[in-house]
Amino acid sequence: MLAYNRAVVIELRTRLTKLFASLGLSRSASQLHVYTFSSFAKRVCGDTALSECEMNEWEGVLLDTIKKKPNDVRAAMPDLQYVFIDEFQDITQTRLDAMFGLKKIYNGLTFFTIGDKNQSIYGFEKKESMDPNYYYKQLYETLHPQKMEMYINYRSYPKIPEEANRYLPEDSRPPVICKNDKKNEPKSEYVYIYQDNRDWSKDFGGYVLWLKEQGVTDLAVFFRTNNEVYHGYSLIKALNLPGIRIRIQGASTCELYRMREIFAVLTLLDTECNKKIKLENNQTEYELKEKIAYWMSQRPNWDSFYMDFAFVLILDYLDFALTDEESHTYGDMADSIRKTLKEDNPQLYKLYDDERFQNRRILLDQQLNVVLTTMHKVKGLEFDAVIITPSVTSLPFNPTEDIDESIPLSPKDIEQIEEERRLLYVAYTRAKKYLFVYKGNRERAVENMQRFTSLEDQWGIRERKVGLDNYNIGFNARFKFHGNKAIAYNVRKNDPVIIKRYIGMDKIGRPFTTYNIIHNGSIVGQLSRSSSIDHRMRTNNIELLTGFFVSDVFYWSYQDTLDADKRKEKEFLKNPAKFNFKKPEPFATKWCEDARKQGYVFIVDIAGYGK
């Protein structure tokens, strides 16, 4: 069985083990092997073949092995009979070619795929085509599968999918509402569509009060981009509403295990890596719960949700260990959680709300959870109530270039806008009970298959691309390492920061300019020359920008820098022209001795619109 991330793999394995046990087929369950595509590559190719490759290159090595070394594949998996592919609509060409290659090696191999074309929203990651039909057509023509269809929607009250269906292609068969949802449908209105550029933030406080009265426990507010999430956060924060807990799930700059709060929990497990997990009387659970709860009380600037989220991941591992005959250590648990968090997977948040953990978590107070998130982060999730805000970003979406509305749409542009329609379909269908949609000019452009020029510059200067490259990590690891402890304990997620120009002199008297990130009067980081904010400030001779927020505090290790230096050296040897035939200078040499001894530094990640 092949799934797209480790969290789904774990969920599938757990569900199938329980299913087979209930059918009296526990032994048969041992013949099921559930993998991500990368772990499947590791099983087939082996550690040695992948040791010199980045994880994002593993699938290419897998395809190459299947094509050129079929005997090695058979040796790794001699009895392969069935392949199940989950979420087929998100397949890539490399993965599809690998599956077709397996069919040539194993003559009697049977495939089973499951997916929903209308939920294909990650086409921007694919090189060949964003259109899911491009891949389904190859599947149909190569394997001639029998097609079976499921249409019943078990999540939402009837009017919610009815509104969402407007974004489906004409030849799509819309889902059928299950009888219970029809039976329980409220008589009062529960879907509100505003077509008139109405300001959602002015309605927000009233919605919170009303939804609380309806017994709603979670409200999600959807945005198209990460910067729009933080713009929305600034509007909600200004309302100063009591009795709500705000959680931000924006676009990830790096893997979740790098977040300060989760890093601390994993480090706690690593320091006692050989300690045996004690399941009797929930001893390990209570010990770790007490420790993490103590941190919550003593570290007010840390994100309590993510500490609790890390604890829920511990609970999930302990439940797994309870069903496994092998003994487990704290180190095993840390490694497993770290692997799970390597993938940018929104479905991980489902674990937090899993009924198994609702009374075992640390945070149990009954506040309304308000989740601010990008639309790409909600696939597989569901919420009692959803607010969809209007976007001002470009269409087709291109964060690095401006859109000219006068140019006719190319076939690729059409594919991109069709994916935006699917994205709105997915967003609408996350709502179970209440849906509030605010439409602006961009949403009308999506509906009418038209271009739309970004209006984000009206809000301020933004980072056009999320990523670690926007920050000078060496600055925190050398010149500002003495401030690392302050970042660790004093910088709170969502705190305001400013960007300020600094003009200095180098050792031989030449002037230089940098742009520093300042939190409560102290420098906590520096933008790199890759940052689009840095570029705009230089170009427009801007000294100071306000309007930014701390989106995350994450760690970066000395080993990470050594590994990055090795990758760059390898890249240089392959393609020196990319570096103007000048060997790149290693960044590890720029770490000060104290930073090397500690082994890591904290980096402040920012988002928002600067003015």
Predicted regions and their residues:
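P-loop NTPase Walker
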Residues: 1-48, 429
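Core RecA-like ATPase module of SF1/SF2 helicases and allied nucleic-acid translocases
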Residues: 6, 216-418, 434
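Conserved nucleotide-binding/hydrolysis micro-motifs of P-loop NTPases
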Residues: 6-9, 39-41, 117-121, 127-129, ...
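Conserved helicase NTPase motor core
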Residues: 33-130, 152, 379-380, 385
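Conserved RecA-like helicase ATPase core segment
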Residues: 97-183
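Helicase P-loop NTPase motor core
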Residues: 144-146, 152-244, 359
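Accessory/regulatory regions of helicases
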Residues: 399-401, 406-480
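Conserved active-site motif detector
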Residues: 444-611
